[in-house]
Regions:
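Generic hydrophobic alpha-helical segments
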Residues: 8-9
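Active-site-proximal loop/hinge segments that shape catalytic or ion-binding/gating pockets
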Residues: 25
């Protein structure tokens, strides 16, 4: 079953809605991004990453919600891990990039994504 924050994130990524994606990340969030060699440790770096991602006309993501595991750490704190596939275009051809993810979500916060790690599957 999909988590509402991940559905919101997925919909925003797939519609290239930068402000919606950006609004989900906490002011002190860290993003270890699929297509970046370095951890993104500020909101400016996170915004730059998604701005760059959205220059690709086919950039998008498909969650495999059946693979998702949720750990409830506290009343409003969850860790969610699983698999998704990034879509992008290279040389006019759609490319699928299988990846794994971990999110730390604080549901008590207006900007609930505290940490997001994403990496290509080996």
């Amino acid at each position: 079953m999909a988590h509402p924050i991940l559905e919101k994130w997925s919909n925003a990524v797939n519609s290239h809605n930068l402000e919606e994606v950006f609004s989900l990340y906490h002011s002190e969030a860290v993003l270890v991004a699929t297509f970046s060699p370095n951890p993104l440790t500020s909101k400016d770096l996170i915004k730059d990453y998604f701005e760059n991602l959205f220059t690709n006309p086919r950039a998008g993501v498909i969650f495999d919600f059946d693979s998702m595991s949720t750990q409830d750490l506290a009343d409003n704190l969850q860790i969610m891990s699983g698999l998704y596939t990034f879509l992008k275009e290279e040389n006019g051809v759609e490319v699928k990039v299988p990846a794994r993810f971990t999110y730390v979500i604080d549901n008590s916060q207006e900007q609930p994504i505290a940490h997001h790690h994403s990496s290509q599957l080996p």
